[in-house]
């Protein structure tokens, strides 16, 4: 008898538990968001799967392409849902234009973070900081000092030295008739430049520091999709005490912390004469300034370096790789670039950053590569307040996803959008019309747009411009096969080449005796 009672009690307990769990799941995941009950028209929503909604689309390998298919079928402004979490998907230049023009402040936050205490896009990060006092302070510091004109001038020699080193390395490969993986070479270049510009040092190859840093950046980028999902579901899961992917995220964050703590200690031990010019000095001065508008912490400094390495390296590396790939597939473009460089720079010295303003065609080629292959194809933001877009109502706290990849191939604003035509950027800059330039900026989104747009675009153009300029000026290039395979892949959230670009450099005549 006792056994029967205890059996019934067990069943009853399990039943109550299942009931409670079902109720909680319904409440947190399937209940419609509050605002959708208001009598406003939400944007159209394409068919979705029961319970999970459109989550399968976001988890697909080439998310920007899956979303492109969806928008070409159902329209440029869509209402998607991940369980019951709403997302607004924007896929045309005109809707993106309307949003950036009318809602810039309203969309100047990226939503909650995946894990607050993480150095990787946690609450100390500049990239994920909400639009508020900390972000405003860091933005000012970034634009005026860290990446400002004076800082760029002071760090010019660092970049020139590393471009020369890159060139010598290619010369060595050319002599040995060896091929190079462009992405790997560009990654070394970017890592060296960023380490020296930000910390005044390079990491040592011998004790494996460089490898460790590279590995951490790759690991973080690999985590981006998981982090995006964790961010989307955070408000719901938090109520259940669940923090999605916390272990993975904190694992990388802790490794960054160890590496950066060592950098801070070693920097403090440097003689005073070697301090004062790099980004770390500027950040330490702000940290020690009692009267600063915002009091930053050591964690803010570490998180800023993590932002910098994740935000600046792979994006620039992929731009170098895609640009070279397009040049290899369009030999007439290579010839025109060479003519321009040879006439402006000549054949007796290496191209320099100061030549770049006189090389508009080189600039146009890089812009065209960024248009067709934006390293960050999807731009995530969050609507802070409810608003109206395209006649539809957007509820507050809705995630915004702008498919920059599709906006930059929108046939309504780009002529022959699928073709690689750098000239399109020459025509518009020559017209010099301020309005046209502004409109151009709003449909050309590789660096995002508005106040949360990329503050590193000028630096990126300088590094990518010098690297591509040097490769075109100094070498002929051989590819395996007829054409470069332009198939896409996505690493984390970064758009990359499915088949990494491998080329063999051949020294151009006359020999580069001046390197
Ligand atoms: C070709 C290279 C690069 C590309 C394609 C790129 C692209 C982007 C994009 C798409 C965003 C988001 C913009 C938005 O939401 O509107 C961004 C943000 C950012 N980028 Fe870049 N970036 C590049 C290079 C750099 C460099 C060299 C740096 C710094 C040295 C940098 C630092 C940042 C920072 C700090 C943010 C966050 C800004 C904020 O949230 O206010 N990026 N970048």
From Swiss-Prot:
CDD domains: CYP93. It comes from Arabidopsis thaliana. InterPro entries: Cyt_P450, Cyt_P450_CS, Cyt_P450_E_grp-I, Cyt_P450_sf, Plant_metabolite_P450s. Heme binds at residue 454. Its main location: membrane. This is Cytochrome P450 705A22. Gene3D superfamilies: Cytochrome P450. GO terms for molecular function: heme binding; iron ion binding; monooxygenase activity; oxidoreductase activity, acting on paired donors, with incorporation or reduction of molecular oxygen. GO terms for biological process: gravitropism; positive gravitropism. GO terms for cellular component: endomembrane system; membrane. Its EC number is 1.14.-.-. It is an enzyme of class 1 (oxidoreductase).
């Amino acid at each position: 008898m006792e056994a029967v009672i205890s059996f019934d009690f067990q069943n009853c307990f399990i039943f109550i538990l299942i009931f409670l769990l079902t109720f909680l799941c319904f409440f947190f995941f399937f209940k419609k968001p509050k605002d959708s009950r208001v009598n406003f028209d939400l944007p159209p929503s394409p068919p979705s799967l029961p319970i999970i909604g459109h989550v399968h689309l976001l988890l697909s390998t080439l998310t920007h392409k899956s979303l492109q298919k969806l928008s070409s079928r159902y329209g440029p402004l869509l209402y998607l849902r991940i369980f019951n979490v709403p997302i607004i998907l924007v896929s045309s230049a005109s809707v993106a234009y309307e949003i950036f023009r009318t809602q810039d402040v309203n969309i100047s936050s990226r939503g909650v973070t995946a894990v607050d205490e993480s150095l990787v896009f946690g609450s100390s990060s500049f990239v994920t900081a909400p639009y508020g006092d900390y972000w405003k302070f860091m933005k000012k510091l970034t634009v005026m000092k860290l990446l400002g004109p004076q800082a760029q001038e002071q760090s010019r020699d660092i970049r020139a030295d590393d471009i020369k080193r890159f060139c010598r390395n290619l010369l060595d490969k050319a002599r040995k008739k060896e091929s190079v993986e462009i992405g790997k070479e560009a990654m070394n270049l970017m890592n060296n430049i960023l380490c020296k510009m930000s910390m005044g040092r390079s990491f040592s190859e011998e004790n494996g520091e460089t490898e460790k840093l590279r590995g951490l950046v790759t690991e973080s980028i690999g985590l981006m999709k998981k982090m995006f999902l964790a961010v989307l579901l955070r408000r719901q899961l938090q109520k259940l005490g669940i923090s999605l992917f916390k272990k993975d995220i904190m694992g990388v964050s802790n490794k960054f912390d160890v590496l950066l703590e060592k950098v801070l200690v070693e920097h403090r031990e440097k003689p005073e004469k070697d301090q004062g010019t790099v980004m770390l000095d500027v950040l330490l001065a702000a940290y020690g300034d009692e009267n600063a508008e915002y009091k930053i912490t050591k964690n803010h400094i570490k998180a800023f370096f993590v932002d910098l390495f994740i935000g600046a390296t792979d994006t620039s590396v992929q731009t170098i790789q895609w640009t070279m790939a397009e040049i290899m597939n369009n030999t007439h473009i290579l010839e025109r670039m060479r003519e321009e460089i040879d006439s402006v720079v000549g054949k007796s010295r290496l191209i320099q950053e100061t030549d770049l303003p006189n090389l508009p065609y080189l600039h146009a080629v890089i812009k065209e590569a960024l248009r067709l292959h934006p390293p960050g194809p999807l731009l995530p933001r969050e609507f802070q307040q409810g608003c109206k877009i395209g006649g539809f109502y957007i509820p507050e706290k809705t995630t915004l996803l702008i498919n920059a990849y599709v906006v930059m191939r929108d046939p309504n604003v780009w002529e022959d959008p699928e073709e690689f035509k750098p000239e399109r950027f020459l025509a518009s800059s020559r017209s010099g019309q301020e309005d046209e330039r502004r409109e151009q900026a709003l449909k050309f989104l590789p660096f995002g747009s508005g106040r949360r747009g990329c503050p590193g675009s000028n630096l990126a153009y300088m590094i990518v411009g010098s690297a591509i300029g040097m490769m075109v000026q100094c070498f002929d290039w051989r590819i395996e096969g007829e054409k470069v395979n332009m198939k896409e892949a996505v690493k984390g959230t970064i758009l990359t080449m499915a088949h990494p670009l491998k080329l063999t450099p051949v020294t151009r005549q006359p020999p580069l005796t001046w390197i």
